Design a protein with these regions (language model features):
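Gly/Pro- and small hydrophobic-enriched strand-loop and loop-to-helix capping segments
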Residues: 203-214
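Conserved alpha/beta-domain cores
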Residues: 1-193, 199-201
Length: 214
């Protein structure tokens, strides 16, 4: 039995309490996204810049757009004027480019650093060791036009909840170690298949798509 978009969002909101919900809009029609918007949802996320810019033109102006996919440096300029949060900053080269484009647009762009916590090699992100060195060197403070709000991570794509929770717990522990020094407020963990486990492990923001539209 399929549920309506409104019913699915209502159920998710009841499950997650005060955790921030960002709706992943990839592969979805404008009609479907408007149904989500009508539930007072304003935070939407895309994996690809081309889709993000296209949907921004077609959707209401008060939507807060998040970038959650692997971002090429040559595409940053297309989203720099308006992006609400780039959650997938996975390398210093990209951080430099975001800072440069933010400066051109006379703004400060909020970001999360993506941390590689999964067993799969194809997932992107900094290692925790690399990040610890970056934070200890205070390198981040050089980037005046980005605001680092916290971390993002993706668990291994598995049905083994023990593995998922172990990876999320590892990231939560790293987040807690640095959050006071770095003034972090956001820990983005959890998608359609694992957001319950992510919240149990301290996530403050979840990225949900297919669970809403099923």
């Amino acid at each position: 039995m399929s549920h309506s978009i409104r019913e699915n969002i209502t159920q998710i909101r009841q499950e997650i309490g005060n955790v921030e919900l960002v709706v992943v809009s990839k592969y979805r029609t404008i009609g479907e996204l408007n149904q989500v918007y009508e539930t007072n949802q304003r935070d939407f996320a895309e994996n690809r810049v081309q889709e993000l810019t296209k949907k921004k033109e077609l959707m209401p102006n008060d939507i807060r757009w998040h970038m959650i996919g692997h971002l090429q440096t040559n595409k940053v300029k297309f989203i720099a004027p308006f992006i609400h949060l780039i959650q997938s900053v996975d390398r210093i080269k990209l951080l430099k480019e975001i800072n440069k484009e933010a400066r051109k647009n006379h703004r400060v762009i909020p970001i999360l650093l993506q941390v590689h916590i999964a067993e799969e090699e194809h997932k992107f992100g900094f290692s925790m060791n690399d990040l610890a060195q970056i934070f200890e060197s205070n390198e981040i403070s050089e980037f005046k036009n980005v605001e680092l709000l916290g971390l993002m991570g993706m668990a291994t794509n598995t049905t083994d909840t023990a593995i998922i929770k172990s990876e999320f717990k590892k990231l939560e522990s790293f987040f807690n170690k640095w959050k006071d020094k770095m003034n972090w407020t956001k820990l983005s963990m959890g998608m359609s298949g694992d957001y319950i486990q992510a919240i149990e492990c301290g996530s403050s923001l979840i990225r949900v798509g297919s669970r809403i539209f099923q």
